[in-house]
């Protein structure tokens, strides 16, 4: 038995295919979803989506949004997403270093909040590359 997973951004469809299982970062922690999961709607945090095909795990960096799960259908609507395999490791590492430097230089609440969000996005991209296969 499988799940139909659809990952959408405002500009494009990132993924639309059958999967065996996913692990999703929500605002209240990670959840695993297998076939016949109870219906839920949840907010998605900036983080990693792990996707299990037959015997292979793939990763995707998600930049926050919402998910709806029910009847073996998973629809994920996010601000932005990138497949781990599409992320350039050197560019992601540089972006992480810049985000860390910007956070240390941030002054005022607004700059600190924006720098923290940029750092979380950069960490999610690096984690998507470095995620260990299960």
UniProtKB/Swiss-Prot annotation:
Name of the featured protein: ATP synthase epsilon chain, chloroplastic
Cell compartments where the protein resides: Plastid, Chloroplast thylakoid membrane
Family to which the UniProt record says this protein belongs: Belongs to the ATPase epsilon chain family.
Gene Ontology cellular component annotations, sorted alphabetically: chloroplast thylakoid membrane; proton-transporting ATP synthase complex
GO MF entries: ATP binding; proton-transporting ATP synthase activity, rotational mechanism
InterPro entries for this protein: ATP_synth_F1_dsu/esu, ATP_synth_F1_dsu/esu_N, ATP_synth_F1_esu_C, ATPsynth_dsu/esu_N
Membrane topology value: Peripheral membrane protein
Assembly: F-type ATPases have 2 components, CF(1) - the catalytic core - and CF(0) - the membrane proton channel. CF(1) has five subunits: alpha(3), beta(3), gamma(1), delta(1), epsilon(1). CF(0) has three main subunits: a, b and c.
Known function: Produces ATP from ADP in the presence of a proton gradient across the membrane.
Superkingdom of the organism of origin: Eukaryota
The entry's keywords: ATP synthesis, CF(1), Chloroplast, Hydrogen ion transport, Ion transport, Membrane, Plastid, Thylakoid, Transport
CDD domains: F1-ATPase_delta (cd12152)
């Amino acid at each position: 038995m499988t799940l139909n997973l659809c990952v959408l951004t405002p500009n494009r469809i990132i993924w639309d295919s059958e999967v065996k299982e996913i692990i999703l970062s929500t605002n209240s922690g990670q959840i695993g979803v297998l076939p016949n999961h109870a219906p839920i709607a949840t907010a998605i945090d900036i983080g990693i989506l792990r996707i299990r095909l037959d015997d292979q795990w793939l990763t995707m960096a998600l930049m926050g949004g919402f998910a709806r799960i029910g009847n073996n259908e998973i629809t994920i609507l996010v601000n932005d997403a990138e497949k781990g395999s599409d992320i350039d490791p050197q560019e992601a590492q540089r972006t992480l270093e810049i985000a860390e430097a910007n956070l240390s230089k941030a002054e005022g609440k607004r700059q600190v909040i924006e720098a923290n969000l940029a750092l979380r996005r950069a960490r999610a991209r690096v984690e998507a590359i470095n995620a260990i296969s299960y």
